[in-house]
Structure formats: C-alpha cells, structure tokens
C-alpha cells in the first residue's frame, strides 16, 4: 500500500494483499476529485465514473464531464461516462414538476441519491466493471454496528457541510458498499488536500445544492419552462381574496418574500391548495404547527421502533435539528410531535431524525389536515 499522510479509507479493504478496486463517483467538483486522489495515493485501483444527467452547462452536465475526465487523466486512472439522462428525467425532472404542480415542495436530492446515483452506480460498478465498492464525495460517515448487524449513517464532522440529511433514504445494501472518505474532514481541509495534490479542480467554485439551478439559472425558471403560467387567487385563511398569482409552483409553505400582495402586517404562505389553484396566506402563527405526519419512512440505521421515541428532527436541510417525540403508526408512517411548535414545516420536504450524530431514519412530510 502506498504511503499517505491521510488516515486509511476503510483499512479492512486497504489491507488486502492485492490492490483493492473501487469506483470513485466523479461529478467534476473538488470534493469527488479529492476522494479519487486520496484513494489513488493509498494504493486503490481507482476507476472514475461520471453520470451524465442533463444537457447544458453546469457541474452536473457538460462542464462536470470535462472536469471529471481531466481529473482522471491527471491521476492516470480510467474514466467511464454513464448516460443517465432518461433515469434523471423520469425520477427527478418529472418528479419535481409533478410535485410542484400538486402544491408541494419536493426534495429531489434524496430521491436522486437513491434512484439515480447509488443504486444504478453500484449496478454499473458490479455488472460492467466487476467492482463491488464505490466512494463518493458526500460529507457523511458510515460505521458497522456489530450488535445490530447493521451499517449506520452518521453526520459528517463538518456540520456546516454535513449531507447525511440527503442520504436518509439509502438502503443497507447501499451503505455496505459505499465509502465517504470526506466524512472526517472539513471543507477547508478538503480544499487544502486538493491543493496539495495539485488537482485541476482545487479552486473550482462551490456548486449549487441543486444541479438544476446551474442549468436553468433558478428554480423559478425551471418550473416556468415546464409548467408555464397558471393564474389563481391568493387568499387568507378565511378565504378572502388578497391578490393573484401566476402559478402555485412559485410558492412554498413559510414563504414571506415575493407574495405580491399589500398588507399592514407580515404574511406567510400557510398552505397551497392545488385543487382550487390557491395560495393561502396568514400570520406567522398560522404557518406554525406542533406536529406533523411523515410517510414513506426509511429506517436506515436501526430497526423501526414499536414505541414512541425521543429524537432530534430536521425538517429542512439548512435548519437545525429540534427535539421531538416520534410516534410510529407503522414502519412506513410516523407522527412527529415537536417539543416546540415549528414554523414552515413544508409538505414534500424530508423530515430526518437523529440521536446525536446517528441518523436513524427519515421520510416525506405530509400535508397537514385543513
């Protein structure tokens, strides 16, 4: 094994007598590039794989393909491009458009990780390349709990960059064959490592959280292109008409800015009524709720509980986790009772619950009852 100044990635694999083979998922960004470089230096037989998701400019598209190829050439490793455009269209683009048209705010990144990236990437690695292990640039950690006989997902050391929230829907099969080498590093350390290797992506700007924004300029542009204008009413919680809108897909629960209505007090989106093509607004308290139902639950790190469970729950990527009691109705549906009422709990987004750094599970927030 080659000498490396960085901790061994999966030493149980690295300690094998022959060079262990691994696929590095390369987006063309600094994070995935650094992963490939670390693994290569530590003696892994690395092969880069880039998923071609969309046409157009952006890290996830043409520019990403070019930069990923440049990294592989720099490291002297093979590079493979997998045409995943149809898969991305069906599972992400169509999913987003349908969700916004239905008045919810979908979370495409967790869907993409499960259905477009990890599953298909593992299949390609095994069936085409004969490789059973993949590594990605996600900021998260995985460990094996021998008592439970399960792989477990944990937050990254760098809480500001932690991406475990987007990985809650992965399976045991995914975790068993995936490595996250950056989980123990901060973003600043990653850039330092990339600079040490002299990677061509070392100074590449940070990408958008949502790759579609890089292609379309904004989520509004993306939705307007696919849904057009669909005028309707903006009403208060009593049904009084306050103004008009050009499409419910321009709004999300908790939104205050850009409502386009005059009011003597701050108003927020309380709910979106797709059937009536209405946006319902109210005062902040009316956009606050003490509990929420969650469907399509995935218990990634632990078995589903039979009894209520004290957790810390995160209902948006950029919001802190808050104390809550989780009450299971079934393994696939739970109720969350927040210790304090929460503002802007948005249908379609993910609720993800933790014990400290350990991600227990998550699911999709349902619409509250009217």
From Swiss-Prot:
Entry EC no(s): 2.8.1.13
Region (Interaction with tRNA): 161-163, 316-317
GO molecular function annotations of the record: ATP binding; tRNA binding; tRNA-uridine 2-sulfurtransferase activity
Disulfide-bond pairs as recorded: 112-211
GO cellular component, one term: cytoplasm
UniProt superkingdom: Bacteria
Record keywords: ATP-binding, Cytoplasm, Disulfide bond, Nucleotide-binding, RNA-binding, Transferase, tRNA processing, tRNA-binding
Residues noted as binding ATP in the record, renumbered to the chain: 25-32, 51, 137
Catalytic activity: S-sulfanyl-L-cysteinyl-[protein] + uridine(34) in tRNA + AH2 + ATP = 2-thiouridine(34) in tRNA + L-cysteinyl-[protein] + A + AMP + diphosphate + H(+)
Family matches, as Gene3D superfamilies: Adenine nucleotide alpha hydrolases-like domains, HUPs, Translation factors
Record-linked Pfam families: tRNA_Me_trans (PF03054), tRNA_Me_trans_C (PF20258), tRNA_Me_trans_M (PF20259)
InterPro entries for this protein: MnmA-like, MnmA-like_C, MnmA-like_central, MnmA-like_central_sf, Rossmann-like_a/b/a_fold
Site feature (Interaction with tRNA) residues: 138, 349
Record's keyword annotation contains tRNA-binding: yes
Catalytic center residues: 112 (nucleophile), 211 (cysteine persulfide intermediate)
GO-annotated biological processes: tRNA wobble position uridine thiolation
Subcellular location: Cytoplasm
Described function: Catalyzes the 2-thiolation of uridine at the wobble position (U34) of tRNA, leading to the formation of s(2)U34.
Family recorded in the similarity comment: Belongs to the MnmA/TRMU family.
PANTHER family with a match to the protein in the record: MITOCHONDRIAL TRNA-SPECIFIC 2-THIOURIDYLASE 1, TRNA 5-METHYLAMINOMETHYL-2-THIOURIDYLATE -METHYLTRANSFERASE
Protein's name according to its UniProt entry: tRNA-specific 2-thiouridylase MnmA
Organism expressing this protein natively: Synechococcus sp. (strain JA-3-3Ab) (Cyanobacteria bacterium Yellowstone A-Prime)
